C-alpha cells in the first residue's frame, strides 16, 4: 500500500486553535471532558509552580520523558537524539527544578548521551514488557541509572530485589486496573506511573482526588 507522507507540522499559534479536551474517549471512558488546548511544556510547569506557591502546597516532582527513536527518518522527520536531548536539557535547566525532576526514556542512546553530557539530571530507564533478562537490558546502558521504570507485567519480587541491589528505585508503568495497582503496592515499589491516580489514591490513602 502506497502511503503519502503529509507535513502536519504547525506553529503553536495554530495548535492553540484546537480544543483537545472536550471530546469523549472510547479508550478512556472515565476521562473528564474539559475544554482545553495543548499547553507548551514551559507554560505547564510555570502554571503548576505558581499554583503550588499560591496555595501553600508541597513542591511538585516532575517525571518528563525524552521521546526519541532510533528509526528511519531520524534527522529528517524529527531531530537526532543528541540534538533533541540537548534542546530538552537547555529548556529543563531554565526551569531550575533541581532534584524534583526525573528524566525518563526508552532510548538507551538518549540516556547514555544525557548521562555523559548532562550528569546533573536524575535519569530513569524505561523498559517494555519484551525487554528480556535484567542483565541483558541493563547492559545496553553505560551506567546505572537512579531509576528503573519497567512495564508492570514484568515487575515482580525478583526484579524489585535486583533494583535494590543495584541501588536503583523501581517505578513501574502503567498499571491501571485496581488489582494491578494493588500488586505493585504490595511489592513495595518506590512510585507508580498510572493513568488513574484516583484509583491509586484510594488504595494507598483511602480516598480519591476530587473531580475537576
Model segments located where?
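C-terminal active-site rim and adjoining tail of enzyme catalytic domains
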Residues: 121-212
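Metal-dependent phosphodiesterase/phospholipase catalytic core, i.e.
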Residues: 1-108, 112-122, 143-144, 150, ...
